[in-house]
């Protein structure tokens, strides 16, 4: 029994919570994603990519940043699994990954800054 191994007995049972607690690796994955979103420009780029698929050049103009800076943010977001890319000839297009994780982060960003998605206001 886990309770018998705790330093203090406060009359509560935590066996259930400990049994279903995510692994240390899962918490580290979440921490790594939060690190990726610790930059305001990166959050803005991710938010835009949740609403459109764009190339580096166009997105650079949209956020008024250099192409190398946007490419750096793309690399970080891609390594976190939040965006994906596809090649069409010489052009590479980026968009938010179609994953529960990316959708949840998108909604979290919107909730935290209290803005409405263009697609949600049209419905």
Regions found by a protein language model. Give the residues of each.
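N-terminal helix-turn-helix DNA-binding core of bacterial DNA-binding proteins
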Residues: 24-66, 92-101
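Residues within the DNA-recognition helix of helix-turn-helix
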Residues: 73
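Solvent-exposed, charged/polar functional surfaces in cytosolic regulatory/catalytic domains
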Residues: 40, 77, 111, 115
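A generic structural-conservation signal
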Residues: 58, 86-87, 121
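Amphipathic alpha-helical dimerization/coiled-coil segments
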Residues: 2-29, 97-123
